Curated annotation (Swiss-Prot):
UniProt-listed GO biological process terms: defense response to bacterium; killing of cells of another organism
Cross-link (S-(2-aminovinyl)-D-cysteine (Ser-Cys)): S49-C52
Keywords, ordered alphabetically: Antibiotic, Antimicrobial, Bacteriocin, D-amino acid, Lantibiotic, Plasmid, Thioether bond
Name under which the protein is recorded: Lantibiotic epidermin
Domain of life: Bacteria
Covalent link (Lanthionine (Ser-Cys)) residue numbers: S33-C37, S46-C51
Annotated source species: Staphylococcus epidermidis
Keyword match Flavoprotein: no
Function: Lanthionine-containing peptide antibiotic (lantibiotic) active on Gram-positive bacteria. The bactericidal activity of lantibiotics is based on depolarization of energized bacterial cytoplasmic membranes, initiated by the formation of aqueous transmembrane pores.
Entry's family note: Belongs to the type A lantibiotic family.
PTM remark: Maturation of lantibiotics involves the enzymatic conversion of Thr, and Ser into dehydrated AA and the formation of thioether bonds with cysteine. The C-terminal lanthionine undergoes decarboxylation. This is followed by membrane translocation and cleavage of the modified precursor. The 2,3-didehydrobutyrine is determined to be the Z-isomer.
């Protein structure tokens, strides 16, 4: 059985971010999210529609 030498960068957590320049004019949406509501309204928080 032959031992395998581990690489030094196994736990390298450095992250490279390629951010594009932008302004704060709001021309493009920053967060794109959607709400999923069930039909009907209820007062409890058991995945009933809180979106009413």
């Amino acid at each position: 059985m032959e031992a395998v030498k581990e690489k030094n960068d196994l736990f390298n957590l450095d992250v490279k971010v390629n951010a594009k320049e932008s302004n704060d004019s709001g021309a493009e949406p920053r967060i794109a999210s959607k709400f999923i509501c069930t039909p009907g309204c209820a007062k409890t928080g058991s995945f009933n529609s809180y979106c009413c």
